[in-house]
Design a protein with these regions (language model features):
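Interaction-mediating elements
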Residues: 21-147
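Bacterial Sec-dependent N-terminal signal peptides
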Residues: 1-22, 38
Length: 147
């Protein structure tokens, strides 16, 4: 009986540990660095929704802003962007290092970027054609995949 009780408690704790709690918030509740970026570069782009996600027993909070033109930007708990989705919208190239922008515009100018991720090891760029590029922290191309 003790084993069964321990297993049940363990399952409940594991569920709580990995559960995510989504909620809508006001723009003013975003970290100051996020507000500054949005006000500086997206002031003319109406915001449809601002969401906060609490994870890991609410020790970590992530944010998502959905804009009217189809751009969605995710931010970490420090207010730094982590992912950009640009389905049907222009890519905000100012958020990428210049070296990556030059490479992408020169070599893949006819492809449409749909997602950009900032990773611990660099940047990942995904195209609607299935091409994925991985750049290191020095903006050097390290991986090219075509799905």
């Amino acid at each position: 009986m003790k084993k069964l009780f321990f297993i049940a408690i363990s399952l409940i704790m594991a569920t709580m540990l990995y559960a995510e709690d989504y909620k809508s918030i006001n723009f003013e509740q975003l970290p100051a660095s996020t507000q500054k970026l949005v006000n500086a570069h997206f002031a003319d782009n109406p915001i449809l929704a601002v969401k906060a996600t609490d994870t890991w027993f609410r020790f970590n909070r992530e944010y998502e802003i959905i804009f009217d033109d189809g751009v969605t930007i995710d931010f970490d708990s420090d207010g730094q962007w982590t992912e950009i989705e640009c389905y049907g919208a222009p890519v905000p190239f100012f958020m990428l290092p210049d070296k990556i922008v030059k490479y992408v515009r020169h070599n893949f100018h006819q492809e449409k970027i749909v997602e950009i991720k900032k990773l611990p090891e660099g940047y990942k760029i995904e195209y609607d054609s299935g091409i994925e590029l991985l750049f290191d922290k020095n903006s050097e191309l390290v991986s090219f995949e075509w799905e």
